[in-house]
Design a protein with these regions (language model features):
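A short alpha-helix capping/helix-coil boundary motif
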Residues: 1-3, 31, 78-79
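Short, low-complexity N-terminal intrinsically disordered segments enriched in polar/charged residues
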Residues: 1-23, 27, 140-144
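Soluble or luminal CAZymes and related metallo-dependent hydrolases
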Residues: 5, 47, 95
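Exposed alpha-helical structural elements
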Residues: 9, 24, 47, 121, ...
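A solvent-exposed, acidic/Ser-Thr-rich amphipathic alpha-helical stretch
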Residues: 23-26, 30-73
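A beta-strand edge to alpha-helix "cap/lid" segment located at domain peripheries
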Residues: 58-63, 70-144
Length: 144
């Protein structure tokens, strides 16, 4: 499935991010897409699909709300809020994460780069590490 507008296809894909939505990945990302986030750099749509399948396996829900965007002729930037629940984090309670995505595209997305706070996504929600991360953040806030 190739949608005419890669921006529309991208946003539609992430509005409800789950195992079923992954079927649309080939219509959105080019075969040789480069994907990066704070943890990974992935080359190729097959490897990206494997990464997303692994991620979705641990999520009980995930959706993105797009808050703002800047669209260029062949690139775009999105500010988003992710709403997710993860089996191993906070007893599967609903969580939120703010982030930004930068994409480059032609007919499909050729490059996708995510920016977000890994501590807010994961570390703050782990039993021992979480309290240490929150303590450090609060001390930094007080000193600035």
């Amino acid at each position: 499935m190739l949608l005419k507008d890669p921006i529309l296809a991208f946003k539609q894909f992430y509005r409800q991010f789950d195992q079923q939505s992954l079927n649309a990945l080939d219509g959105i990302y080019s075969e040789d897409v480069t994907f990066s986030d704070p943890v990974h750099i992935i080359q190729g749509s097959d490897k990206l699909k494997q990464y997303f399948e692994s991620m979705c396996g641990n999520l009980t829900s995930c959706r993105f709300d797009f808050i703002d965007e800047v669209i260029g002729e062949n690139d775009a930037c999105f500010k988003w809020e992710m709403h997710y629940s993860h089996r191993s984090l906070k007893s599967n309670a609903p969580l939120r994460l703010m982030g930004t995505t930068f994409i480059k595209y032609s007919e499909k997305i050729d490059a996708h780069e995510d920016f977000y706070d890994m501590g807010a996504m994961l570390y703050e929600h782990l039993p021992l590490i979480g309290s240490a991360v929150r303590l450090v953040k609060s001390r930094i806030k007080k000193s600035s």
